[in-house]
């Protein structure tokens, strides 16, 4: 067997961001993938509250998930949205747990924004198809299609 490889040398190769957050919600560590996932360099996130980055509409459900994690519940598939540094929205899937011994939350964040866009497009295509097949008149069909397209914007 070869020499032991220090974790830092391969953690920064991960495509997903590894995050460590303390009990009070402050980021204590985030891997280099934070730039790809959140749009922030690690040093821009460390020391800040993780909730500062959460999309305002997702704050309450995120706070609830944090409470559950702090009670020891595992969260393998929690999704919420973050506001990237450039102002765009990132859809994030989290896998997280609490370490009572270390008093930290350890989580892996995966950017699922492209998947969410594809799902929205697929749902829109179904809705447009449904409108085309079920509308009684052209104006009604156009109104429904316009509503669907507007929802994508």
Please provide the spans of the model-predicted regions.
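Sensory modules in modular signal-transduction proteins
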Residues: 2-19, 23, 123
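Signal-transmission linkers at sensory-effector interfaces
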Residues: 113-134, 139-140
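PAS/PAS-like sensory domain cap-loop motif
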Residues: 34-45, 56
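PAS/Per-ARNT-Sim sensory domains
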Residues: 56-67
């Amino acid at each position: 067997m070869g020499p032991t490889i220090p974790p830092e040398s391969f953690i920064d190769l991960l495509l997903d961001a590894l995050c460590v957050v303390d009990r009070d919600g402050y980021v204590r560590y985030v891997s280099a993938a934070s730039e790809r996932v959140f749009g922030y360099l690690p040093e821009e996130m460390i020391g800040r509250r993780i909730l500062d980055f959460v999309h305002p509409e997702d704050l309450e459900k995120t706070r609830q998930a944090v409470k559950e994690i702090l009670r020891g519940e595992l969260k393998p598939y929690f999704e919420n949205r973050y506001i990237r540094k450039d102002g765009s929205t990132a859809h994030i899937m989290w896998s997280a747990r609490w370490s009572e011994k270390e008093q930290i939350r350890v989580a892996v964040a995966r950017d699922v924004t492209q998947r969410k866009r594809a799902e929205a497009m697929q749902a829109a295509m179904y809705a447009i198809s449904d409108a085309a097949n079920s509308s009684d008149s052209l104006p009604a069909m156009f109104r429904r299609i316009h509503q669907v397209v507007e929802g994508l914007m």
